[in-house]
Amino acid sequence: SQSTSGASSVGQAAALAAFEGGLGFLAEQVAAYRQRRDVLVAALGQVAGLEVLVPQGGFFVFVRCAGLLGRYRPDGQRVNSDADVVAWLLESGVAGVAGSAYGLSPWFRLSIATATDTVREAGRRIARACAQLHSGETT
């Protein structure tokens, strides 16, 4: 039979267990995300052309990439937008989302909801990819 009101006994038991279980796990999660955030912010803070908005919570880091716009990839393609930056990063092994998808151009979003070593490697790959962009001028 179906019920249209009241919580099931299984649901009630699960809710009670969640409330009685305490929040000890939360401190561990906060510390882990803070470490990942700090690793990525430190790495990207060294990259010319990027500015990082340090998040106070959550698991996304927003990065301003206006300093990369107008530069050229090694294949000669011009980087005109945050979407172009994200496409270049994807080719370099890092997935992100263009800020223009949220009305936040010229920013892009990165997730830190992964292992710290993965975040560290992403920072290295982003630095390497950005270092490959050039002004297009020959000297």
What are these regions (language model features)?
Residues 1-139:
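PLP-dependent class I/II
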